[in-house]
From Swiss-Prot:
This is UPF0114 protein in repA1-repA2 intergenic region. Signal peptide: none annotated. The lineage of its organism: Bacteria, Pseudomonadati, Pseudomonadota, Gammaproteobacteria, Enterobacterales. Keywords: Cell membrane, Membrane, Plasmid, Transmembrane, Transmembrane helix. Its main location: membrane. InterPro entries: UPF0114 (IPR005134), UPF0114_bac (IPR020761). It is a multi-pass membrane protein.
Length: 178
């Protein structure tokens, strides 16, 4: 009975697969939105202000960052929770090397980068945004920054504790051998 339950739980990991496919669909939507912005700007290029152009470019950068975040979550999540990808020759260098903690750190760093781009966009349009909203944008951004820094710090502490424990165990093993 126990083996059947464990097998069912193990097989249930495939239930997350449609969610990763959904993220692939979101990536397609982001690609369409990216090129919509690019095609929108082409006819306007000689008439748009410099700050308007910068705002469009910031929007494009925002889309690229979110797309990269989606790819990272899809690939590393699939490899960590479903199955290893058997891709010869075209495999990305970081695939298979990211554990859950490094994924969390990468995701939080990407969120901070996305928030930074959004905050820069808000600062470029301060005349359209109330001071109260700007303050809230800054508070939210700082919350992301502090959270990302805190998670990275905790991850570093955990890794140093693991390394310290590993060294202590190897010292004890070596003493017993003597």
């Amino acid at each position: 009975m126990k083996n059947i339950i464990e097998k069912m739980i193990y097989i249930s990991r495939w239930l997350i697969f449609p969610i990763y496919l959904g993220l692939s669909f979101c990536l397609i939507l982001l690609t369409l939105k990216f090129f919509q912005l690019v095609f929108f700007i082409f006819p306007e290029i000689f008439f748009i202000s410099e700050s308007g152009l910068i705002l469009v470019i910031l929007s494009l950068i925002d889309i690229v960052l979110v797309g990269g975040l989606l790819v990272m979550v899809m690939f590393s999540g699939y490899e960590n929770f479903i199955s290893k990808m058997n891709i010869e020759g075209d495999k990305l260098g970081w695939m298979g090397t990211m554990d859950v903690n490094s994924i969390k750190n990468k995701v939080s760093s990407a969120i901070v980068a996305i928030s930074s781009v959004h905050l820069l966009r808000v600062f470029m349009e301060t005349e359209k945004v109330s001071n109260e909203k700007i303050v809230w944008y800054v508070i939210i951004h700082l919350t992301f920054v502090v959270s990302a820094g805190g998670m990275a710090y905790i991850d570093r502490l955990n890794k140093s504790n693991i390394n310290s424990s590993t060294r202590k165990c190897s010292v004890l093993v070596n003493r017993r051998k003597k």
